[in-house]
Amino acid sequence: MSYDRAITVFSPDGHLFQVEYAQEAVRKGLCAVGVKGKDSIIFAVEKKSVQKLQDSRTTRKIYKLDEHIYLASAGLSADARVVVNHAQLECQRFRLSYEDAIDVDLLVRYVARVQQRSTQSSGSRPYGVSTIIGGFNENGQPQLWKTEPSGTSSAWNAAAIGRNDKVVLEFMEKNYQDGMTRDRCVHFAIKALLEAVESGSKNIELLVLERGKAAYMSDTELHRFVVEVEKEREEEAARRRRLAEED
């Protein structure tokens, strides 16, 4: 039997190959990171190169789900758009039903359920997209979650998806600190993302989410942070070379 074609059939060694293929599509997608700070959440994504006459605003990988919740994706853009539409509709349904904003963890469970259903439904295929979802609940505490094509969801302090995500996560694990300020989170997110993407602010898109407001960082401010990070990386590289020469 061709187990790699059947969506709802396990292989003898316990694999769902279509789900694994969806995960591979994510690993080939543009890198995205999310960082949770003391009172802010930072989304930073690798920018897709666009044609000269193309409007770059139509290729964004960071989406608004509700006033207090945003999502960054890696993988197939068309699949991400479908998942985002499901999430936005759920936010609207919740407001209409309860006259209140949906909690972040409740929305994450819904998104994960949408992704999981596609792994066991005939006539469809798993969504080739992973998401980083961040927002603020009523108590004002920031939350950061990650969902995967299999339908699993998990809470994170800092997360990475897309190509070279393991390299980025390794950097984050070594350098993350609890309770970082807004600017420190931005610096950390950019430095982590530059582990996976080419240097330069032109290749990065960044959104700062704080309680009650969200804004894309301007090119000027983003460039300033990138220059600081690149200078810091050069100093660290020079220090390592000196230590190697002394040894």
Curated annotation (Swiss-Prot):
InterPro entries linked: Ntn_hydrolases_N (IPR029055), Proteasome_alpha (IPR050115), Proteasome_alpha-type (IPR023332), Proteasome_asu_N (IPR000426), Proteasome_sua/b (IPR001353)
Principal cellular location given in the protein's record: cytoplasm
UniProt keyword terms in alphabetical order: Cytoplasm, Nucleus, Proteasome
Location of this chain's protein in the cell: Cytoplasm; Nucleus
GO biological process: ubiquitin-dependent protein catabolic process
Keyword Cytoplasm (UniProt): yes
Signal peptide (from-to): none
Function: The proteasome is a multicatalytic proteinase complex which is characterized by its ability to cleave peptides with Arg, Phe, Tyr, Leu, and Glu adjacent to the leaving group at neutral or slightly basic pH. The proteasome has an ATP-dependent proteolytic activity.
Protein name as catalogued: Proteasome subunit alpha type-7
Organism encoding this protein: Trypanosoma brucei brucei
